[in-house]
From Swiss-Prot:
Active site (record annotation): H103, E175
Matching PANTHER family: TRIOSEPHOSPHATE ISOMERASE
Descriptive protein name: Triosephosphate isomerase
Binding of substrate, residues: N11, W12, K13, G181, S220, G241, G242
Organism: Shewanella sp. (strain MR-4)
Length: 260
């Protein structure tokens, strides 16, 4: 069985501040002292430089831990007349290692199709970023027992456009739409069932990828349910929304992941 290092990625969405970043790093510097889990901060783009500076300023205090920076989105284009967009190269220049791709809010609110998501996945890797690919089903799809069908479709388009080996440098986040921002989380058993399906799906085309890829759970993860979720054999950590805005809760989640 592969030894997959757990990851906790904090997606601030359109929230947070430079002060929140400073508060997080103040707690990280005294409490985050080992590398048994990887921590990724994904603030709004306007705060990437603030987080980068804090990473540099706290380099000595964070020695021995793995705290990284990621972005919440990127353009599928390298450059051009795309007002308001940010390219993969720009994110790389800012110090990002990761970027969230295909979050349900981007798909739903901004009309990002699976084809666009696949293009963004490619753009991220082209510029040396590791994509955190989000997949997940809606409430009606789950009620209709179409969860596996929906997720397979979302995965297959990325595979068709980028190849299976592209997942050698990728993270997957399962985020059931009915649990994102609702306060209603999937049960550990529900999460494990879907994560196992994702791993099996990828194993069918590459046993190595299937065994080694990290699959995060995202959807109302809190310190009260994280231990049971992270204890599941195919759950490798969490993509955290609301709880990432509370420094104490987020640090608790990081600590739980380190002991998972």
């Amino acid at each position: 069985m592969a030894l997959r290092r757990p990851m906790v990625a904090g997606n601030w969405k359109m929230n947070g501040s430079a002060a929140l970043a400073q508060e997080l790093f103040k707690k990280f510097a005294s409490k985050l002292q080992n590398d048994s889990a990887e921590v990724v901060l994904c603030p709004p783009s306007i705060y990437l430089e603030s987080v980068r500076q804090l990473l540099e300023a706290n380099k000595e205090a964070l020695d021995g831990s793995l705290v990284r920076m990621g972005a919440q989105n990127l353009s599928q284009h390298d450059f051009g007349a795309y007002t308001g967009e940010v390219s993969g190269q720009m994110l790389k220049d800012c110090g990002c290692r990761y970027v969230i791709i295909g979050h349900s809010e981007r798909r739903r609110m901004y009309g990002e199709t699976s084809n666009i998501v696949a293009e963004k996945f490619a753009a991220a890797q082209k510029h040396g970023l590791t994509p955190i690919l989000c997949v997940g089903e809606s409430g009606p799809a789950r009620e209709a027992r179409r969860t596996f069908e929906v997720i397979a479709e979302e995965l297959d388009i990325v595979i068709q456009k980028n190849g299976t080996m592209a997942f050698d440098n990728a993270i997957i986040a399962y985020e059931p739409l009915w649990a994102v921002g609702t306060g209603k989380s999937a049960t550990p058993e529900q999460a494990q069932e879907v994560h196992a399906f994702i791993r099996k799906r990828l194993s069918e085309v590459s046993p190595f990828i299937g065994e080694n890829i990290r699959i995060l759970y995202g959807g109302s993860v809190t310190p009260s349910n994280a231990a049971d979720l992270f204890a599941q054999p195919d759950v490798d950590g969490g993509l955290i929304g609301g709880a990432s805005l509370n420094s104490s809760e987020f640090l608790s989640l990081c600590t739980i992941a380190m002991s998972a």
